[in-house]
């Protein structure tokens, strides 16, 4: 990819700031990252036309907030219809046609980093799959969508059975009280909009970008009550730590087995010591591996059910990256992908601790050792995805 100068609201800036259109914005820290902003003129991202993510405050996003940190409205204040085609949503879509992409945090986006954004021409020519309404929007260069989002990310409940230091400072589990009520009110609005009336519409939900779907009473009740027969073309994807995803729970959700699609299980370690002592506090390594072996066997029965094993790279675990690939290949042979990404700032660490964890920063004392790890040919393995670490490996191989 060719490169252009950093934009004022993109990868060159960090911290809290006030944007003239979007108000208060938090740009994640990328200082110390050896990175150049790519030239994305003529490229296309379907997130801006299809994706809605709702967080615990009711704020609505058109992508992961770390990658596109501008919310387009609040579900507690406005209808989904008004938010989806409101002025903020339209403003974000304009960058597809202007080609400057200055709102995206390209350094954190794994799709941009791995150069996997299709061209607009490929979408229009049918070389890249897309909905008909997407093609019509591209042809007409319109920034108002004719249909509601086709992918909905439930990120409104942070409840989790673990307390991973990169994500939170204490265990969060909402089962009653005002904080629970607020999160359930948001969830009820989303259910009302997308999961109340049976339909054969093709759409998907993702649970969850905020906690664990099985630790959350809100999500657990929602998934237990869903009947796939009412939504035959609904795809259900999940992100979970896997500890509670037991064979017993699997049997409990038998009515949605045929709706299950991608399941992202985040281990962030290749050893029991690192997992239970550093990256996944309150976790149970042996139970996790047992659950994953069971889920791996279910992939043989349900061809659309795919498991992606995630690994967020930081100082505490980067030396286990190779071992992680070997572990997944050996123990879970039916996996779809082994996906890596770099740690980002969720506000749980002090600046000093965060910088110590960011092995990707050029000024980190062990940055070269990290690059040496990335030189291993195992990262060329089929089904290994480096995402936003792609540029790091490119740098390592150029040494």
Describe each model-derived feature in a short phrase.
Residues 88, 100, 231, 300-303:
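Residue-level recognition of short, well-ordered coil/turn positions
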Residues 72, 111-263, 273-300, 327, ...:
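Conserved alpha-helical substructure of the radical SAM core
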Residues 45, 60-64, 104-109, 160, ...:
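Short cysteine clusters
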Residues 1-78, 82, 124, 155, ...:
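Radical SAM enzyme [4Fe-4S]-AdoMet core and its adjacent flexible, acidic
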Residues 49, 57, 69, 101, ...:
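Extracellular structured ligand-interaction cores
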Residues 38, 68-111:
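Membrane-interface junctions of multi-pass transporters
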Residues 29-33, 50-51, 87-99, 148-155:
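Short, intrinsically disordered, charge-biased short linear motifs at domain edges
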Residues 40, 99, 104, 155, ...:
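Disulfide-bonded cysteine motifs in exported proteins
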């Amino acid at each position: 990819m060719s490169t252009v100068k950093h934009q004022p609201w993109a990868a060159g800036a960090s911290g809290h700031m006030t944007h003239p259109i979007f108000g208060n914005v938090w740009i994640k820290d990328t200082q110390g990252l050896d990175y150049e902003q790519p030239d994305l003129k003529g490229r296309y991202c379907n997130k801006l036309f299809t994706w809605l993510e709702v967080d615990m405050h009711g704020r609505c996003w058109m992508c992961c907030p770390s990658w596109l940190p501008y919310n387009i409205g609040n579900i507690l204040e406005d209808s989904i219809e008004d938010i989806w085609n409101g002025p903020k949503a339209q403003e974000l879509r304009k960058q597809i046609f202007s080609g400057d992409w200055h709102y995206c945090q390209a350094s954190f986006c794994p799709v941009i980093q791995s150069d996997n954004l299709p061209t607009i021409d490929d979408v229009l020519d049918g070389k890249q799959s897309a909905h008909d309404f997407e093609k019509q929007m591209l042809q007409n260069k319109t920034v108002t969508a004719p249909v509601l989002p086709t992918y909905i990310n439930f990120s409104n409940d942070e409840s989790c059975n673990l307390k991973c230091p990169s994500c939170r400072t204490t265990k969060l589990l909402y089962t009653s009280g005002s904080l629970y009520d607020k999160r359930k009110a948001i969830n009820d609005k989303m259910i009302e909009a997308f999961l109340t009336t049976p339909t054969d519409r093709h759409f998907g939900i993702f649970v969850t970008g905020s906690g664990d779907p099985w630790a959350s009473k809100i999500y657990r009740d929602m998934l237990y009550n869903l009947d796939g027969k009412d939504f035959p073309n609904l795809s259900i994807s999940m992100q979970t730590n896997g500890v509670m995803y037991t064979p017993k729970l699997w049997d409990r959700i038998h009515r949605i087995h045929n709706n299950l699609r991608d399941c992202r299980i985040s281990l962030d370690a290749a050893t029991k010591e690192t997992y239970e002592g550093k990256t996944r506090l309150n976790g149970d390594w042996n139970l996790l591996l047992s659950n994953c072996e069971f889920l791996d066997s279910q992939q043989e029965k349900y061809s659309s059910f795919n498991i992606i094993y995630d690994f967020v790279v930081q100082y505490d675990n980067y030396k286990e990256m190779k071992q992680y690939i070997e572990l997944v290949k050996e123990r879970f042979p039916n996996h779809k992908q082994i996906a890596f990404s770099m740690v980002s700032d969720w506000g749980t660490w002090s600046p000093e601790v965060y910088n110590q964890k960011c092995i990707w920063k050029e000024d980190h004392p062990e940055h070269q050792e990290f690059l040496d790890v990335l030189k291993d040919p195992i990262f060329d393995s089929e089904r290994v995805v480096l995402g936003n670490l792609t540029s790091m490996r490119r740098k390592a191989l150029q040494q």
